[in-house]
Amino acid sequence: FNLANFMRVHLFTALGAFFTTLAGFIHWKLTGEKVLGVGDASGMFPIDSNTKDYDAAMLDKFDALAEPYGFDWSLRDILPKVLVAGENAGTLTAEGARLLDIDGELEAGIPVCPPEGDAGTGMAATNSVAVRTGNVSAGTSVFAMIVLEKALKNVHTEIDLVTTPSGEAVAMAHCNNCTSDLNAWVNLFEEFANSFGMKIDKNELFSVLYNKALEGDADCGGLLAYNYFSGEGITAFDEGRPLFAR
């Protein structure tokens, strides 16, 4: 018998603990409900799009692998409940209202939707939630999300499987690097202009440079930018080094 091992095995049960995403944690603080939108939940554990819940077979496999460690909880015990868009995810509690409004004017009782992350929000905002639709989000990082008409047959390390807020299977390809290198070049042009006393609106600067790019050669004059400000898992680089080649 070892106290440390005993606490490790029973700590989740003793504390009523669970694990979740940032959206799920905020939702719990505001409503007291340990729930998660199916899209965000799919980033924590594989989802069965038929049941709109965690993949039961994979849950069983995990618990079987964890059994020798003697935990008195199963994985399902510590995962938040999965909800799809439109389902009741609880209401704002008095405690949650105080977190949002320290003046006390906001009242409790407001119904709250299932918590989702930015990926699910982007799919809904671009109306890309139906089968064979997709959207691209480009910023500091970039990813494409395609709603699948059938399950993938093989494992593709470049693809993460997530879901829409309504539980449809989605293939996501994500890259860490997108606009950081472009922003650095635009900042260089801005600094150049400022050095000559010219004050240029940043939005106008982007617009002019984007339109100027349309006048360039199809092969960009033989110029090539590797925008790896950080590592890139999809191409197996642990660290990034920006490179501009001629």
Report the location of each language-model feature:
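Active-site core segments that coordinate phosphate-bearing ligands/cofactors
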Residues: 1-39, 45-72, 86-246
